[in-house]
Every structure is written in structure tokens, then in C-alpha cells.
Curated annotation (Swiss-Prot):
Lineage, uppermost ranks: Eukaryota, Viridiplantae, Streptophyta, Embryophyta, Tracheophyta
InterPro entries xref list: ATPase_E_C (IPR038495), ATPase_V1_Esu (IPR002842)
Function summary: Subunit of the peripheral V1 complex of vacuolar ATPase essential for assembly or catalytic function. V-ATPase is responsible for acidifying a variety of intracellular compartments in eukaryotic cells.
Keyword match Ion transport: yes
Name of the molecule in the record: V-type proton ATPase subunit E
Key words of the record: Hydrogen ion transport, Ion transport, Transport
Amino acid sequence: MNDADVSKQIQQMVRFIRQEAEEKANEISVSAEEEFNIEKLQLVEAEKKKIRQEYERKEKQVEIRKKIEYSMQLNASRIKVLQAQDDLVSNMMEAASKEVLNVSRDHNSYKKLLKGLIVQSLLRLKEPAVLLRCRKDDHHLVESVLESAKEEYAQKLQVHPPEIIVDHHIYLPPGPGHHNAHGPSCSGGVVVASRDGKIVCENTLDARLDVVFRKKLPEIRKQLVSQVAA
């Protein structure tokens, strides 16, 4: 092999090495670019995920805030409705109290009512002797119906007429606005107790009104709610 052949082979080897080096460099470049693109894509996706999570978190906060505000507004509305209902009930109670006060002004009707209240009290207590309290203004009316009340009670239970002692020392308070506008008041009726004071039947007009009103209160509130809903 002469020098020309050797030189030719060397050039071929150099070209081969150079070509292989270029191919390897190209492979490395392509691989590096692919890795870079993958890493870049991963970073982009991670950032997108982070943004989505932040958006969802803020969206949930907004929804929670809306629910809280709605609940507060709903509660405020309910409180207003309940307050309006309470005001209406109070006005109804006040109007009823005024009507009850008028009952004692009709002496004939009130006299019959007093007798009925006394008989009812006696039937509840079923005591042979009782103490009765009334308003000072009603004292003469009570005295006028005592005997007939005792007889009616005795006939109903087939017993001896009871002894009724009218308290002349302690009276029930006068009607509203009688003298002391800010003190206790009584629209009428009686309070009957056993002699030892252990059993008491409060049969005043105010107590009867309160009992009736408490029984009717659920029905009244139901009607008020239906009126508001309509």
C-alpha cells in the first residue's frame, strides 16, 4: 500500500468519524430538545393545574360567602316576620283585654258571670269551706250571688252548701287605669282558695283570657303565617 492509498484510507476514516460525531451530536441535540419540551410541557401543565386549583378555591369561597349572605338575609327576614307576628299578637291581646274590661261594666251580665266563675271555682276545689277574693268594686255583686252559687254547687255534687268567706281585708287589684296606671290590675272575676291556702283557683277574667289566648296562640300564629305566605 503506497502513501496515496494510506492517505485515502485516513481521509475515509476521518469522514466516517466526523459523520458519526455529527450524527451523535444531532441525536444529543434532538434528545435534549425533546427533554426540554417535555419539561416545559410539565411546567406549563403544573402551572395550569395550580391556576385551576386557585380558581376552584376562590370559586368555593365565593359560593360559601353567597350561602352565608343568603342565610343571614333569610334569618333577618324570618326575624322581621316573627317580630311582626309578635306585634300583631300583642295588639290582639291588648284589644282582647280592653274587651274583657268592658264585661264588668254591664252589671247584669257581669253578675251572672261572677256567679258562674264562683260555681266553677267551687267545683274545681271541692272544699267544704273556701276563701274568696274579689275586687273592692265587685264586693256587693259577689255578695249578692253567693247564696245562689253555693246552692247550685251543692245541687251539682249532691253535697251540703260550702262555707264561702269573702276576704274583706285583701282585695284583688282594681281595673286597668283605675288609679295606679303602672301598678297591678284586674279586669274582674274571683280568686278562690282552700282555707289553708294550699289550693288556689285563679278565676279572674285576665287569667281566663290568658288561658284561652295561650290555647289559641298556635292557631293564631298559623293563620298569620298563611296570610304572610299568601
